[in-house]
Structures are given as C-alpha cells and as structure tokens.
Amino acid sequence: MKLVILMRTDIKMGKGKMIAQAIHAAVGATSKRNWKYLKWRLTGEKVVVLKADIETINKKIKQCKKQGIRTYEVIDAGRTQVKPGTKTCVAIGPDDDEKVDKICSDLKLL
C-alpha cells in the first residue's frame, strides 16, 4: 500500500510551499477512513512524492478514475506564491502498490 503525491514542477513554488501542499494532499487523501486507509496505516504508511506538470497530473487523475483509485486534488487559495485556484498537486491512493505503480511508474522522484 502506498500514497503517491504528484507535485507540480511547472510552476514556481519554494520548498516550504511544496511541503505544505504535500501535507494538504496527504491529509485530504486520508480523511476517509476506509479499509485501504487502515491497511496503509498498518503497513508503514508509505508516501512517495513525484514530479509532474499540470498536463501529466490531469492525465493521471483520469487514469485513476478509470481504475477506481481515489485521488485528492489540492487547489491553492493563492495567498502566497501561486494564483488563486491553482492546482498544485494531487494525492493518489492510498492503494495497492501495483495499481498505483501502473499509473505512476513513468514519473521521477521529487
């Protein structure tokens, strides 16, 4: 089980901003306490952050929906480094490693 966060690298965000956005994504993705969440918690809470541009993120969201994999999109309020309404990242999962890897294995670590 793993949770993958696709972080936008095609917009300018500082490291602190990226960390905050990743936390928002992780909290949002794990807010529904279903059996996948419980399994993820019991198996080490693996989290991986990968680089992506907006086109790739939107493509991966569509692929997840087709495969029944939960996603959580972070839309920024625009108070600091990006414009209001900017999609900064998306969380995928938590779900089985194999299912998530099928969608995200072509992306590189942040």
Residue spans for each PLM region:
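Glycine- and Gly-Pro-enriched alpha-helical subdomains that act as flexible
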Residues: K2-R33
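Short basic, glycine-rich beta-strand/loop surfaces that mediate nucleic-acid
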Residues: V4-L6, T43-E55, K66-L110
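Low-complexity, intrinsically disordered basic tails/loops
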Residues: A26, R41-T43
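Flexible, glycine/charged-enriched surface loops at secondary-structure junctions
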Residues: W35-W40
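Short amphipathic alpha-helices within nucleic acid-binding modules
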Residues: I57-K62
